[in-house]
């Protein structure tokens, strides 16, 4: 998959509009559109990092050097969010996970 198509695919999978991704990355809507539709794109390392972060993937995945799946990327994004939560909230999430695990094993 080409770079621009990868961005567009990830963006739509996450339910983000061009405007929303642009806002999350400090870019313009037209810049994101150009990245998705022009070849070859030339984003800076800083922009690549911002876009990858907003889409919940690694830069390597974004540029096609890694085959991390969207599911893996979602897991990575979840754990990134999880690690930033207060300890009590993380404890509650772990307890919920144990309860759900018990229910699914029955």
Regions found by a protein language model. Give the residues of each.
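A short, Lys/Arg-rich alpha-helix, primarily the initiator
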Residues: 1-13
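N-terminal positioning helix adjacent to the helix-turn-helix/winged-helix DNA-binding module
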Residues: 3, 43-47, 74
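Aromatic/hydrophobic pocket-lining residues that form π-stacking "cages" and hydrophobic walls in ligand
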Residues: 7, 48, 93
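Conserved amphipathic alpha-helical interaction elements at protein-protein interfaces in regulatory
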Residues: 13, 57, 99-102
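Short alpha-helical DNA-recognition segment
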Residues: 16-35, 39, 50
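DNA major-groove recognition helix of helix-turn-helix/homeodomain DNA-binding modules
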Residues: 26, 44-61
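Interfacial/linker helices and their anchor residues that mediate assembly or domain coupling
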Residues: 67-106
């Amino acid at each position: 998959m080409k770079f621009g198509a990868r961005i567009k695919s990830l963006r739509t999978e996450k339910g983000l509009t061009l405007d929303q991704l642009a806002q999350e990355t400090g870019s313009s809507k037209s810049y994101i559109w150009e990245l998705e539709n022009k070849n070859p794109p030339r984003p800076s390392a800083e922009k690549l990092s911002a876009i990858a972060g907003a889409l919940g993937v690694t830069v390597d995945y974004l540029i096609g050097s890694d085959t991390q799946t969207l599911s893996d990327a979602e897991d990575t994004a979840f754990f990134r969010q999880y690690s930033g939560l207060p300890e009590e909230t993380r404890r509650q999430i772990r307890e919920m996970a144990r309860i759900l695990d018990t229910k699914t094993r029955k």
